[in-house]
Each structure stands twice: as structure tokens, then as C-alpha cells.
């Protein structure tokens, strides 16, 4: 029995040894030469192009990118974000770089509105960028500013510092002034002229008087041409106007001086010093300070030195020997002034005691 291929319906081989077999994935045989694209809704044109290319001469692989036109190959998937009409199907869309004007307006909005209000900066200042792009640009700007101390490899747009307020054009600083009516502008100009030249109201009267005088003088004089009189009057008028303008111009202040400030309130009284002492009072002269001497004590003998031999009774002291009866003939005493003292001394025995009794007692023992 001859083998029959289930793939090409030819005899002599089976589907496993078929030379025209394709790739089988999940039970489905894929016969397309290119499997990079699928037959999805976003790739129908490529699917049709590859199908039509398969019926060609066969010189190239059917469905290869070389057989597909540029506009067909550029369709691809809807989620791949390919550039439409590009020759390269894998070319990705690139963002447009920020210009200096956009970055300057971004810095101005960042200075006015602060960090975080990216929607306000995008709406009022950088109108060509979305809030997401403004936030991304701000993140790059802050990272660049935090790495200022490091070595910079190349200059960047983020190195620009915010300009001063004086360098910003007036239409950007005050955008609401464009809607001001013409009448208010005229009134503002009139008020400015009035404040700058308050004394200019009196100038026409002076000029008119001098002009009348010059006209009278020209009318009174005869024989002078009118052109000469008109030239003289115009020159005098020009000199007077220049003098008035020089008087009305404010004097320039020195760079280190302060403007003169006049007090807004004047007190009804003025303080001045008033002496309390009467007019004829003469103050006493100051007393001189007295000088004090330091007194130091000195040892002085007020009496003559005492002689020990002259002391009362000191030379009459004697120690007498006792007699044979055991009684002392002379007692150790101090005789003052030759008188006897009635006071009993500790060195004298009691005279009232009887010696016989003592002896008897001793003998009795």
C-alpha cells in the first residue's frame, strides 16, 4: 500500500517527511513564510500584502518584507507606535527638543507659580507643551541643577538661569493690560502729566504776558521788519521754555543718599530744655577729697620695769626646820605688812589639837 501525505496529498511519503511541510503550532500548521506579523486587526494590510506576495514569481520568500511596499510595511500593530509613512517599519517616534524660548517661559512660570503647578505653567506660559511634558522637563531641570558641582561634559539647555523680572517683556508680565480701554489710557496719561509737572499750569500765563510785551514792543517800533521781530520772540520763548523745563526737572539724587521725608504730623508743642534752679543760684564748689594717713600701732612702755626684789614678802619666805617635838618653829607663810593673818593655812597644824591624845591613841594601837 502506497503511503499518502496528509499535507500535500501526494503519494510516496507521509506528512512527517513532506518537503513542503510548514510549522505546526498548537495543532495548527503555519504555511506563511514570515511569522513576524499576525493576521490581527492592526495588521490586515500586511496580511493581504504577504498573501498576494505568495502568488508571485517565487524568486523571493513569500510574505517577506522586501515584497511589501513601504506604506504597507509601516502599518504594523496599532500598539507599536510606528511612524506612519516611514520607510523603516521599526523607526520609533521621537519627541521634539525644547527650544530656548520654551525653556525661558518654563522658568518664568516656575518662578511665578512655583513647583507642582505644571498644568498652570502649560496653560499660561508654555502653551506648546502638555502638563506631562512640562513635569518631565522640570524633573530633568532639577536633576541638572542638583549636579552643578559635578564636572559637566557638555553644555545643556538646563544650564540657563531664570532671567530677572526687568528683562521680561511687558506683555508677559502684565497680560491683562491689553484689554484696557483707550479712555482709561488717556486718563492715565493725563494724570501722569499732572503729577510730573504740577507747576506747568502757570507757565502759559507767563508766556502769554511776555508774548504780549514782545508784540507791543514790535508794534511800537517802526522801521523794523516783521520777520526779525518774530524770530526774536520765538528765540526768547524757546529760552524761557528751556529754563522752565530745567526748573521742573527733578534733581538727580546721589547713589548713597536717601530721599527727603517730610513729617505728616506736626505736634502743637515744641520741647525745649528748662533749668530747674533759679537764675541767681551759684553752685558750691566741689569739696576736695581729704587724704588719710595710715596709723600703725607702736609698742610703748607706760611704766618703769618692775624689780622682783621689791615685791612684798617675796624675800621673807623661808622654810624652817621642825623641833624635836615635831612642831615647826616658823611656819611657811607670807607676812604682809608685819601683821598676822587669822586665816588658817594648809601648812600649819591645828593648835587646838592635844598631842597627848594623839600619843595615847598611837600607843593604844
UniProtKB/Swiss-Prot annotation:
GO terms for biological process: intracellular auxin homeostasis; lateral root development; leaf development; leaf senescence; negative regulation of DNA-templated transcription; negative regulation of transcription by RNA polymerase II; positive regulation of cell growth; post-embryonic plant organ morphogenesis. Expressed ubiquitously, except in hypocotyls, root tips and lateral root primordia. Residues 220-254 have a biased composition (Low complexity). PROSITE patterns: HTH_MYB, ZF_CCHC. Residues 1-21, 41-99, 214-254, 321-365 are annotated as: Disordered. The keyword Nucleotide-binding does not apply. Disruption phenotype: Defects in root growth. No visible hypocotyl phenotypes. Increased sensitivity to the gibberellic acid (GA) biosynthesis inhibitor paclobutrazol (PAC) and auxin (IAA) that inhibit hypocotyl elongation. Reduced leaf size due to impaired cell expansion associated with an enhanced expression of peroxidase (Prxs) genes. This phenotype is reversed by SHAM treatment, a peroxidase inhibitor. Increased accumulation of H(2)O(2). Delayed senescence. Enhanced auxin-responsive gene expression. Induction: Slightly induced by CdCl(2). Accumulates in the dark. Diurnal expression pattern with maximal levels in the morning (at protein level). Specifically induced during leaf expansion. Expressed in old and dark-treated leaves. Residues 118-142 bind DNA. It holds the Pfam family Myb_DNA-binding. A motif (R/KLFGV (transcriptional repression)) lies at residues 24-28. It is found in: Nucleus. Transcriptional repressor. Direct regulator of the transcription of peroxidase (Prxs) and reactive oxygen species (ROS)-related genes via the recognition of 5'-ATCACA-3' motif. Binds to 5'-TATCCA-3' motif (TA box) and represses the activity of corresponding promoters (e.g. sugar response genes). Regulates hypocotyl elongation in response to darkness by enhancing auxin accumulation in a phytochrome-interacting factor (PIF) proteins-dependent manner. Promotes lateral roots formation. Promotes cell expansion during leaves development via the modulation of cell wall-located Prxs. Contains a R/KLFGV repression motif, which may be involved in the activity of transcriptional repression. This is Transcription factor KUA1.
Amino acid at each position: 500500500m502506497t503511503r499518502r501525505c496528509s499535507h500535500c496529498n501526494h503519494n510516496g511519503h507521509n506528512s512527517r517527511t513532506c518537503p513542503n511541510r510548514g510549522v505546526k503550532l498548537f495543532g495548527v500548521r503555519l504555511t506563511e513564510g514570515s511569522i513576524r506579523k499576525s493576521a490581527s486587526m492592526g495588521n490586515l494590510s500586511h496580511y493581504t500584502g504577504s498573501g498576494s506576495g505568495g502568488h508571485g514569481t517565487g524568486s523571493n520568500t513569500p510574505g517577506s518584507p522586501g515584497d511589501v511596499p513601504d506604506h504597507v510595511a509601516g502599518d504594523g500593530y496599532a500598539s507599536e507606535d510606528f511612524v506612519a509613512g516611514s520607510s523603516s517599519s521599526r523607526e520609533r517616534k521621537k519627541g521634539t527638543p525644547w527650544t530656548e524660548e520654551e525653556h525661558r517661559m518654563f522658568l518664568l512660570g516656575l518662578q511665578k507659580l512655583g513647583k507642582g503647578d505644571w498644568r498652570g505653567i502649560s496653560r499660561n506660559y508654555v502653551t506648546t507643551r502638555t502638563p506631562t511634558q512640562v513635569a518631565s522637563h522640570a524633573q530633568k531641570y532639577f536633576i541638572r541643577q542638583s549636579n552643578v558641582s559635578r564636572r559637566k561634559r557638555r553644555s545643556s539647555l538646563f544650564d540657563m538661569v531664570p532671567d530677572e523680572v526687568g528683562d521680561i517683556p511687558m506683555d508677559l508680565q502684565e497680560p491683562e493690560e491689553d484689554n484696557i480701554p483707550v479712555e482709561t489710557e488717556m486718563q492715565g496719561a493725563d494724570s501722569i502729566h499732572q503729577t510730573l509737572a504740577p507747576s506747568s499750569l502757570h507757565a502759559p500765563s507767563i508766556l502769554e504776558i511776555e508774548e504780549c510785551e514782545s508784540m507791543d514792543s514790535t508794534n511800537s517800533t517802526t522801521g523794523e521788519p516783521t520777520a526779525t521781530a518774530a524770530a526774536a520772540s520765538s528765540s526768547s520763548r524757546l529760552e524761557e521754555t528751556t529754563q522752565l523745563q530745567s526748573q521742573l526737572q527733578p534733581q538727580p539724587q546721589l547713589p548713597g543718599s536717601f530721599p527727603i521725608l517730610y513729617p505728616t504730623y506736626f505736634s502743637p508743642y515744641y520741647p525745649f530744655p528748662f533749668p530747674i534752679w533759679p537764675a541767681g543760684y551759684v553752685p558750691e564748689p566741689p569739696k576736695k577729697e581729704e587724704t588719710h594717713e595710715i596709723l600703725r600701732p607702736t609698742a610703748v612702755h607706760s611704766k618703769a620695769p618692775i624689780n622682783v626684789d621689791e615685791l612684798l614678802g617675796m624675800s621673807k619666805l623661808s622654810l624652817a626646820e621642825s623641833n624635836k617635838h615635831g612642831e615647826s618653829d616658823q611656819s611657811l607663810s607670807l607676812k604682809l605688812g608685819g601683821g598676822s593673818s587669822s586665816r588658817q593655812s594648809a601648812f600649819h597644824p591645828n593648835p587646838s589639837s592635844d598631842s597627848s591624845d594623839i600619843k595615847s591613841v598611837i600607843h593604844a594601837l
